[in-house]
A protein has these predicted regions:
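Interfacial/gating helices of multi-pass transporter permease domains
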Residues: 1-15, 84-85
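Residue-level recognition of pore/gate-forming positions within transmembrane alpha-helices
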Residues: 13-16, 95, 123-127, 146-153
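Helix-loop junctions and terminal segments of transmembrane helices
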Residues: 15-39, 110
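C-terminal transmembrane helix end/exit motif
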Residues: 22-27, 105-106, 110, 133-162
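Membrane-interface junctions at transmembrane-helix termini in multi-pass inner-membrane proteins
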Residues: 35, 93-119
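Interfacial transmembrane-helix starts/ends
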Residues: 41-55, 64-67
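Short membrane-interface helical motifs at transmembrane helix boundaries
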Residues: 60-79
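Hydrophobic alpha-helical transmembrane segments in multi-pass integral membrane proteins
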Residues: 61-66, 126-139
């Protein structure tokens, strides 16, 4: 229904700030990794630093989402929306996982590790199926989004491993 869609949209937009806000970290790492060519030690240091910085930013956002969901929803929507508040941290976790997936994929691309990338279509199909099947309510849908994000992260780590 429209009310549920609106509640999800508000939580989703707020949660996407995690993904959008961490993009510069991933994008800054890409040229640095390419620059270091065959120096695996230096590349790994860049990746670890990017992961640590990403973790700190994401952790801070998730703590805010967990502790103050009602306040955040009210600030950004102008009203209290209980359904949005109840899923904000879940959708935030999903976006956090996608931010780490993005970092992993950009790192692999910068290292020239793109073999097997076509298999990611399986993860897109899996996400669609999960979200279609688990759509009875907004919380269930949000948890399915986390599950699909976890599988995408695991896939990005396994399919493009060195």
């Amino acid at each position: 229904d429209e009310t549920t869609a609106g509640a999800y949209a508000i939580a989703s937009i707020l949660a996407k700030t995690i993904f959008w806000g961490t993009q510069p970290i991933s994008k800054a790492m890409f040229p640095l990794s390419v620059e270091n060519g065959d120096n695996k030690s230096q590349k790994r240091n860049i990746l670890l630093n990017a992961c640590a910085f990403l973790f700190v930013c994401i952790f801070a956002a998730l703590v805010l989402f967990y502790l103050f969901p009602d306040l955040l929803i009210k600030i950004f929507s102008g009203k209290e929306i209980a359904d949005s508040s109840s899923i904000l941290v879940y959708v935030g976790i999903s976006m956090a996982l996608l931010a780490f997936t993005n970092l992993s994929l950009l790192y692999k691309v910068s290292c020239g590790k793109t073999k097997g990338a076509a298999l990611f279509l399986v993860f897109v199909l899996l996400e669609v199926l999960l979200l279609l099947y688990f759509s009875a309510n907004i919380v269930q849908f949000s948890l399915a989004l986390i599950a699909s994000s976890v599988t995408f992260l695991i896939g990005s780590l396994l399919l493009l491993r060195e």
